[in-house]
Amino acid sequence: MTMHNSVEFQDAFDVIVVGAGHSGCEAALATARLGCRTLLLTLNLDKIAWQPCNPAVGGPAKSQLTHEVDALGGEIGKMADRTYLQKRILNSSRGPAVWALRAQTDKREYAAIMKNIVENQENLSIRESMVTDLVLGANDEVIGVETYFGVAFQCKAVILTTGTFLGGKIWVGNKSMPAGRAGEFAAEGLTETLNRLGFETGRLKTGTPARVDKRSVDYSKMQLQPGDAEVRWFSFDPDVWVEREQLPCHMTRTTPETHRLIRENLHLSPVYGGWVEAKGPRYCPSIEDKIVRFVDKESHQIFIEPEGRDIPELYIQGFSTGLPENLQLQMLRSLPGLENCVMLRPAYAVEYDYLPATQCYPTLMTKKIAGLFCAGQVNGTTGYEEAAAQGIVAGINAARFVRDEEMIVFPREHSYLGTLVDDLCTKDLREPYRMLTSRSEYRLLLRSDNADQRLTPLGREIGLIDDRRWQMFTRKQEQITGEKERLYATRVKENDDVGKAIASNTQQAIKGSITLADLLRRPGFHYVDLDRYGLGNPELTPAEKEGAEIDIKYSGYLARQQSQIEQIARQAQRQLPGDLDYTTVDTLSKEAREKLNKVKPLTIGQAARIGGVNPADINALLIYLELRQSKHQKGLAVLP
């Protein structure tokens, strides 16, 4: 760290953002749009908003985060809607709480468009530089940054969004080199600065699979994975939607030969060879981790996904590895359809420094240094969507800090974004954190479809939602409210022609009459059915129809979830048996069983605060304890 009295500043800004990945871009755009003079510093101006791993946005829980960032006025959802190669709704056969939109994106187009956006944003300057030091004022508040080559910039707030670049080292087998990503040098000096300031730092690991030439692949041996015929959107702003031709993805599977090659060469991987001890992401394991952890699985799904419309590279999803390069090609060629593949880039593992986010307030400002914020992978998360969500939170609060306004804490009951930040700042997490729907006890309330209803009023209050977006939002909510009133008030009689048709086609009688709302509550009956019988409202958009239907159809479930939340709160002081073997509680997630058995919490409240133990696990544990107690009272053998 450098003290203020020994520094000559080249220029002055309100906010400086260090790192121009998905977190840094959201943070910088937010502060600039809120009127702060902002400087965005990056190691490479040509890699702004780069997608170094899977070029995709969305998926379970991640799509909810993307919708929420958009609802606040952020950019990631718009980018995915403009640059997608394919879109699919995952979990569509289940309830709307777990519906997940996923877009395969064109990585070069995505980066080029985001670069153009940040380059042309008012109040935002971008520059290539490596930040190595923070400049502190007389009261240990941040007042600037210093670069590797000795240039200093003054500011009132700094947002660190350094990704995997702090002390980054990439591994292929037992070979390593300093790098944040393949071909890009690591950031030096900043970790040491943070350590000198008293911050705890740790090491984490992630990895990315090889890329192969699409012209060397035989798709006829793979299963086609087309996009959805009906395209859905991340952004609530129809003006940014771009209808475009979709490209197919494909699926293949590992073979006994794949597994043999990996098992016989495990000792050559960075982790199993003992050269890397950093924890990797539990929910995105390397292929060697899968073979070791799931011994009884004969085969694993591998998805073959295009990286762009006009480039030959294919991303081999589910096949990340740190094994030696010469072995990687043998492994790839053991997959059906890839027998003659040409490898364009090898897979590699990367380890990097991170700051456990318990050192931050829920505003994402650090507790030790006023004006210093951290967001994204440096906080121990994994994923572009998690990074973008933290970026907009840090950007909003840095702007408010600069203006001496009260900073905003996003409550976990209002958003996945709030759940994410709350988990990071309160739980001692020692492995990369990925957002999951099970991490939220409010997931029925926190759906993709109502992210605007939950967060756009706040985005408007903050200053990120303009008049046009606000008018669109208020009209949509008025339409949904009015339609719900109509559905509750309008009745169909059993002797009407339409009533007879509905009873006949659904094999469910109508006794006397029924409201349209009660029809929608019937299993298998949807708004499209109302349209079919001429009972729908043709003036509504698909999103408005869906919003009204979900609110009505799931009203009972929403009330039940609220009751469960209140029950967990009441049970916080409930004692847990000291002899309880959590490995035998099958209704707990595997991660929860591991963590609970290790910590042996004394109460339900303590169990709920353990990293990796989700609200769904706590609910399952309460049910298990009730069953255990019930059996004990009946004099039956106690459950194990």
Swiss-Prot record:
Its cofactor is FAD. It is found in: Cytoplasm. It comes from the Bacteria. One of its GO terms (molecular function) is flavin adenine dinucleotide binding. Gene3D superfamilies: FAD/NAD(P)-binding domain, GidA associated domain, C-terminal subdomain, tRNA uridine 5-carboxymethylaminomethyl modification enzyme MnmG/GidA. FAD binds at G19, A20, G21, H22, S23, G24. Keywords: Cytoplasm, FAD, Flavoprotein, NAD, tRNA processing. GO terms for cellular component: cytoplasm. SUPFAM superfamilies: FAD/NAD(P)-binding domain. NAD(+) binds at residues 280-294. This is tRNA uridine 5-carboxymethylaminomethyl modification enzyme MnmG. NCBIfam families: mnmG_gidA. NAD-binding protein involved in the addition of a carboxymethylaminomethyl (cmnm) group at the wobble position (U34) of certain tRNAs, forming tRNA-cmnm(5)s(2)U34. It comes from Nostoc sp. (strain PCC 7120 / SAG 25.82 / UTEX 2576). Belongs to the MnmG family. GO terms for biological process: tRNA methylation; tRNA wobble uridine modification. PANTHER family: GLUCOSE INHIBITED DIVISION PROTEIN A, PROTEIN MTO1 HOMOLOG, MITOCHONDRIAL. Homodimer. Heterotetramer of two MnmE and two MnmG subunits.
